[in-house]
Amino acid sequence: MLNSASHLLLVIVMCVFAGTSSFAQTAPGKYWVRFTDKNNLPYSISHPEEFLSWKCIGRRDRLGIGFDERDLPVNPDYIAQVLEMGAVSLHHKSKWFNAITIQTEDSLVIEAIRALPIVAEVRSTHSDIITGQSHKWDIESSPSNELRSTRLCDTFPEYGLGWRQIEMLNGQWLHSLGYRGAGIDIAQFDAGWNRTDILPAFERLREEGRIKGVKDFVWNNDSTIYGLNNHGTYVLSIMAAYLPGQLVGTAPEANYYLFRTEDPFSEYPVEEDNWVAAAEYADSLGIDVINSSLGYSLFDDPALNHSYADMDGNTTRCSIAADIAASKGILVVNSAGNSGDDPWRYITAPSDADDILCVGAVNADEEHAWFSSYGPSSDGQVKPTVSAMGQAAAFAALDSSIATGNGTSFSSPVIAGLSACLLQAFPYLSQQAIRDAIVRSASQYESPDDALGYGIPDFVVARELLLTNEPAFGDFEMSAFPNPCNDRLTVTLADAKNCAVAFTVYDAAGRHCADMAGIVLTDGHGVAFLDELVKRLPAGHYTLHAHWELRNSFLSFTKIKQP
């Protein structure tokens, strides 16, 4: 358990940077340095390939998201001027905030940096004050047989103890349709993934090479990712585990990036800087989903503490960054926090961000979990956004058993994983469209409250909402038969009859796979036979884009292997 001054997230401390003014008395540690402008850069938004991956550029192009000044890197000359001031080392760069985080033990250097004409502000983000927050990653375990005796399922036995947390949201039906997150990139922000490199729960993940990258934003020591802390292991297993009959995660076929942003041994605003740096890096890679089972409100140095008034989505750096990430096309999913039974009571940053999914926790009976933080945000937004099972939730333990535990850190990956499955089904849709469908599918959509938000989503309903409203995301309705198909596919596009139509196919990751141009739909019903197109494709899930006369239509289809 955490001490009384702590605010649980997974049963972790949740703290946030206090937006106070620069301190007259500085101390050894880390500092946030924000610059005045981005003048005289050696980069241009007309050449984004110089600082963004092609996957990121492709996603932006596909979703119609442009490039702006925030995408441009920090001026390297400005960074050099700061580092030349004395005993200063660079911790992070933030292009979204036009800032850097530095480390120094010389307070005189900080005053000299403040005086530079290129510097807009300097704030302390870390000092040497420690108040005993070392227990922030404790897990409150409950007996495994709590689920074993009542929640196994004969119809879907592969889920084992994880059955109820998936079934509650109808996630098993997305899986049965073949949507298990394949081709979707999920970045997990956490503290450590102890034994993830050897645990059986992640064997298939490792063998298939779907841990695509790791990065340590705390100590810049990637070799320690698979050690130091267990929290990330437990959270990852809820999404990625594959132990049929014991535990299958919500997105067992997705790709994963493991980013350490949390220092498990202290609590300071620099962890927000780490979060920002990781979010920017995720965007540059073209990541689709961020799961962050983290939150910030109180710090080891009380002078840096946040207030509930700061939980307005527009004050803390990590909350602002979460919204920027969403605007760049990333679906951000964050734990609401575990302060429901504490004096703090409310959600913490970045869960207060406007355009993300803030996830609360319920028990197996779909009742508010006693620890789950309450909303609203201080500016009146409905928070949490949605809720999922986080009390007695099943996860992979370090001894290779399946354990259960409490925390919104466990409900968040349930939602993040199933959201990835929905993105797989609709890869051409924006994160906002996916988020809105999830919210609209929830059990309390018409009457949200401060405990569960809009309620518990139903991912079958979310899929149906997206299918029903598909023409709204293109211009005109298109249907396909058979779907799933093998080497034959016929589409009907009534609005394009007697027109020349160009067809383009994208895979689940949004990559261009094949196209056919100039297909004239002369049939009276606007029918096109795309057998030659689908014959070129391997088995998998695809999006078909039809384009004619400045008009567009989209649909999802699946190609299966020949029997």
Over which residues does each language-model region extend?
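Protease zymogen maturation seam
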Residues: 115-185, 197-201, 302
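C-terminal subdomain of the subtilisin-like protease fold in secreted/lumenal serine endopeptidases
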Residues: 163, 285-291, 424-479, 483, ...
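Extracellular S/T/G-rich loop segment that most often corresponds to the catalytic His/Ser-adjacent loop
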Residues: 190, 351-424, 428
